[in-house]
C-alpha cells in the first residue's frame, strides 16, 4: 500500500478540528484545534501543518442534512474548502460528517473527558473520526 499523508478537517464557524494519519494510512490521530479568526490566519496555521507533515490531501467533513441533501452549512464548508484547496495547492476529498460531533461527544463522555467548555477537544475528535472513516473506506476499496 502506498504511503499517504492526509489531514482531516472538521470545519466549523468558530473552530477547525484537525487530525492527521500515520504514513501507513491506518490510524487517524487528533492534532490540534484552530480557533478561527480570518481566512488568511486559518491558511497560515494549516500551512505550517501541511509542510511539517508533508500533506498530500485534505479530507473535509461535509455536513449533509439528515435527508442527505447539501444544505446551507454544507455549502459554506464547500466554499471554504475550495478556497483552502487553492491556497494550499492541495486536492480535497469530502466525507459525510453527519453526527461526527455527537459521536465525539459521546466518546468523550464515556471516558469522563467531556466538558461543554472544551469544544476544541470535540472538534479535534470529530476531525479524527472524519479522517478515520476516509482511511477505512480507502483501505476497503483497495482490497
Swiss-Prot record:
Transmembrane regions: none
UniProt GO MF annotations: nuclease activity
UniProt entry keywords in alphabetical sequence: Cytoplasm, Hydrolase, Nuclease, Ribosome biogenesis
Signal peptide segment: none
A UniProt-annotated Pfam family: RuvX
Keyword Nuclease: yes
A cellular component annotation (GO) from this entry: cytosol
GO biological process: rRNA 5'-end processing
Entry EC no(s): 3.1.-.-
Paired cysteines (S-S): none
Uppermost EC category: hydrolase
InterPro entries recorded: RNaseH-like_sf (IPR012337), YqgF (IPR005227), YqgF/RNaseH-like_dom (IPR006641), YqgF/RNaseH-like_dom_sf (IPR037027)
Compartments where located: Cytoplasm
Keyword Cytoplasm on entry: yes
Family classification: Belongs to the YqgF nuclease family.
NCBIfam families: RNAse_H_YqgF
Known role: Could be a nuclease involved in processing of the 5'-end of pre-16S rRNA.
Protein name: Putative pre-16S rRNA nuclease
Lineage: Bacteria, Bacillati, Cyanobacteriota, Cyanophyceae, Oscillatoriophycideae
Amino acid at each position: 500500500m502506498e504511503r499517504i499523508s492526509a489531514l482531516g478537517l472538521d470545519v466549523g464557524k468558530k473552530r477547525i478540528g484537525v487530525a492527521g494519519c500515520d504514513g501507513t494510512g491506518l490510524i487517524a490521530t487528533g492534532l490540534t484545534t484552530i480557533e478561527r479568526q480570518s481566512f488568511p490566519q486559518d491558511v497560515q496555521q494549516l500551512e505550517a501543518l501541511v509542510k511539517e507533515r508533508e500533506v498530500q490531501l485534505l479530507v473535509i467533513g461535509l455536513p449533509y442534512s439528515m435527508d442527505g441533501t447539501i444544505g446551507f452549512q454544507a455549502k459554506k464548508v464547500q466554499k471554504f474548502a475550495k478556497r483552502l484547496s487553492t491556497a494550499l495547492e492541495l486536492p480535497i476529498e469530502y466525507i459525510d460528517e453527519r453526527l461526527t460531533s455527537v459521536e465525539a461527544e459521546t466518546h468523550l463522555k464515556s471516558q469522563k473527558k467531556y466538558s461543554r467548555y472544551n469544544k476544541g477537544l470535540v472538534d479535534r475528535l470529530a476531525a479524527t473520526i472524519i479522517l478515520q472513516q476516509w482511511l477505512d473506506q480507502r483501505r476497503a476499496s483497495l482490497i
